[in-house]
UniProtKB/Swiss-Prot annotation:
This is Large ribosomal subunit protein uL22c. It is found in: Plastid, Chloroplast. Keywords: Chloroplast, Plastid, Ribonucleoprotein, Ribosomal protein, RNA-binding, rRNA-binding. The lineage of its organism: Eukaryota, Viridiplantae, Streptophyta, Embryophyta, Tracheophyta. Part of the 50S ribosomal subunit. GO terms for molecular function: rRNA binding; structural constituent of ribosome. InterPro entries: Ribosomal_uL22, Ribosomal_uL22_bac/chlpt-type, Ribosomal_uL22_bac/org-type, Ribosomal_uL22_sf. Pfam families: Ribosomal_L22 (PF00237). One of its GO terms (cellular component) is chloroplast. This protein binds specifically to 23S rRNA. Its main location: plastid.
Length: 133
């Protein structure tokens, strides 16, 4: 189950946080490192073409953050870049797999928390015009 939390801190940044995603944090970091600092549209193309299972939850989070930006803040999706993307280790789900002769073998299923921050670069361009005049 993916639980998505949405936060807003600055007037030019939009957050989306996915918690308890059932995948290894190392595998999710491998994908996040590829998309950090890229534009929103370029990121969606990269994630659609990558052949990894970790791409789909990250794709959903980025899409959700962009929907937050356009609906809540009124930003254009073409002006968004991924300013911060991080993967943290979540809780470990522990289960028992039945074995022969009444024994049980523990299975550890790792989860991770992914946070995505999108930044609107058009606001920076407007501020730069006022600073250098």
């Amino acid at each position: 189950m993916i639980k998505i939390k949405k936060r807003k801190r600055n007037t030019y940044e939009v957050y989306a946080l996915g918690q308890h995603i059932c995948m290894s944090p190392h595998k999710a970091r491998r994908i996040i490192d590829q998309i950090r600092g890229r534009s929103y549209e370029e990121t969606l193309m990269i994630l659609e073409l990558m052949p990894y299972r970790a791409c789909y939850p990250i794709f959903k989070l980025i899409y959700s953050a962009a929907a937050n930006a356009s609906h809540n803040m009124g930003f254009n999706e073409a002006n968004l870049i991924i300013s911060k993307a991080e993967v943290n280790e979540g809780t470990t789900v522990k289960k028992l797999k039945p074995q022969a002769r009444g024994r049980g073998y523990p299975i550890k299923r790792s989860t991770c928390h992914i946070s995505i921050v999108l930044k609107n670069i058009s606001l920076y361009e407007e501020y730069d015009e006022y600073i250098y005049i």
